[in-house]
């Protein structure tokens, strides 16, 4: 079954994802907004089944931007590694099982966001020991319907 072509071309999609990384850096004074932009970049903007290399690079850049801008966070690579892994999983899912409905897309985004949270916590724990979990993740899950709906429109879906 052929997929419909997404509205954004490949170079434009990369540019939008890089703007997401720049947004992660620019929102450093506001950690809640920064985390929301990081999750949107890793889970919704970076994954592109047409280019796994760019998917990985943009996700890792977003992870390093987040990790490098937080003051009390160890800079040992836990966030970029988790972001890289989740973005590649999301790209694989988009290639082999494109979203068929908006509800399934939102459930997928929720699962990938939760996976990013757990994997990031696990990698940071392995690198530096336990850290307190902050409330910004509640903001991520609370705003999920908004950003998942906005990202839904650019996904290749079954005809």
List the predicted regions and their residue ranges.
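Terminal, non-globular segments
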Residues: 2-159
